[in-house]
Amino acid sequence: MSSKVQAVLLLVGVITFLAVHAQEELSENTESERSCARLYERCSMTRRPCCNNVPYVCSLLGTYCECKKGLIQTVGDFIGI
């Protein structure tokens, strides 16, 4: 087998390996992003916490919780702090 054919086969093998590895990492990232609730989404204290340590507000009975920024965070974002 010529050296050019070997080089092409090696290159195809490396590209295939890198593509599979990159796809596995991407699926891990999306799975971890799904495991937390974004701002103004429904959350749960134990099963689905808020992303980025955003605080949550629950109903009086604790049956409905939602990720919301507090007043200080909202003012800080408005001012740009």
Curated annotation (Swiss-Prot):
Prodomain positions: 23-34
Originating species: Lycosa singoriensis
Keyword Chaperone set for record: no
Transmembrane spans: none
Subcellular location: Secreted
Entry keyword set: Disulfide bond, Knottin, Secreted, Signal, Toxin
Name of the protein in question: U17-lycotoxin-Ls1a
Tissue specificity: Expressed by the venom gland.
GO molecular function, one term: toxin activity
Keyword Signal: yes
Location (main, coarse): secreted
Signal peptide residues on this chain, from the entry's feature table: 1-22
InterPro entries: Spidertoxin
Disulfide bond residue pairs: 36-51, 50-67, 58-65
Cellular component GO terms held in the UniProt record: extracellular region
Pfam families per record: Toxin_9 (PF02819)
CDD domains in the cross-refs: Spider_toxin (cd12960)
Domain of life according to the entry: Eukaryota
Family: Belongs to the neurotoxin 02 (plectoxin) family.
Entry comment, domain topic: The presence of a 'disulfide through disulfide knot' structurally defines this protein as a knottin.
